Amino acid sequence: MTTRYRVEYALKTHRRDQFIEWIKALLAVPFVLYSQPHGVLEDPDRSVDTLSQTREEAHRRYSEIFRDIEAMIDDHIAHQNDAENPFPSKLKLLVPSIGPFFTRLPLEAAFKFQDNKRYISSRRFVSPSFNDIRLILNSAQIMAVTTYGTLQLATFDGDVTLYDDGQSLEPTSPVIPRLLDLLRKNVKIGIVTAAGYTTADRYYSRLHGLLDAMANSADLTPSQKQSLVVMGGEANYLFEFDSSSPHLLAPVPRQHWLTPEMAAWNEQDIAQLLDVAEAALRDCIKTLNLPATLMRKDRAVGIIPVSPEIRIPRESLEETVLLVQKILELSTVGRSRRVPFCAFNGGRDVFVDIGDKSWGVTVCQRWFSQKEGPHGVIKGENTLHVGDQFLSAGANDFRARSVGTTAWIASPVETVELLDELAELMGKKMS
């Protein structure tokens, strides 16, 4: 029983998104009922009409399901906005892990958009997949932030979102002109990355393509150029664009941007939490015989491969994340919850950071709100965070869901497609 529990929970549940899995299960029913895999054996002339009818019926049933989920989300939003209602929404009962929604989600329209691109209703052997639903949710979210309100802030993860894992944002990257287009539309940009560098030169080496393009742009106003910040170490180091700086980024003193809640974090608690994490990581290196070395920073501690050529197995990284996270949660300083932390799998390494991306995105919201004055407050419904790690454990974009809308991508190519979709929707709204 213990072994089965460990397999089912520790190795599988943390790699799933309950909301997406629930939608996937709902869509499996019409797929089973209306797909026609035997059509490949029928007479071609007959099968064309049959498949067309089947596709239309599957599309209709899928659309109905997304319309019903859309209504459930509306009901969930009504419940979360009613502080006096003690009862959970129907969606909360069906998907207990569901969190807050900052906007409505036009899921039916988003499904029809993605169905035209991915031909989901035409498939006979492959049911609507996790990735299909993830992209439908992305489309619904960017439809919402451009239709029901105004996008004021877009924040991005670094690795796997803006550039490939371990690489840099090169001048030839197709992401760059799309980010510049957002700046021209007066959308603020925050790059919220786990990379915990304390100096501007290290961030310049990762982001030089974008920073140089901004510095050399003739059609960006000084105000628009000031609309980019880099938040490093999840929520620990803030840099703003500065064309006069040698590395085009200027560090912002911590006392200028810390939120009142972050300013209350005790340095002794931070040191104690990192000490516990360090001991747990050392134990993992020994127990799992990891080819890794420990790295301690002022606001983070982690393990990295002993040489760049070595890749630690994914399962070992996940085991390390889950073990360290559990040890921290059960520790005295962890139980006190005085200092938030994030244990995450970086793909090649594992780190524990003080704070998490919900704090990083919050700092970006407040930083730009302060610059805009009392009428420029950036709320969750006006914020879009784009990242690749949204699973419930070992994923550092997950907690950004608590402070703004999100889009879950799987590669820089998907980021480009998302930004193109966003630009088209923003263009329609302005026209």
UniProtKB/Swiss-Prot annotation:
Pfam families: ISN1 (PF06437). The active site is at 157 (nucleophile), 159 (proton donor). Its cofactor is Mg(2+). Allosterically activated by ATP. ATP binding is a prerequisite to magnesium and substrate binding. ATP binds to 2 of the subunits in the homotetramer inducing a closure of these 2 subunits and the release of the C-terminal loop, thereby activating the enzyme. IMP binds at residues 157, 159, 165, 193, 349, 357. Its EC number is 3.1.3.99. GO terms for biological process: inosine salvage; nicotinamide riboside biosynthetic process; nicotinic acid riboside biosynthetic process; nucleotide metabolic process. ATP binds at residue 117. Belongs to the ISN1 family. Homotetramer. PANTHER family: IMP-SPECIFIC 5'-NUCLEOTIDASE 1 (PTHR28213:SF1). This is IMP-specific 5'-nucleotidase 1. It comes from Neurospora crassa (strain ATCC 24698 / 74-OR23-1A / CBS 708.71 / DSM 1257 / FGSC 987). The gene is isn-1.
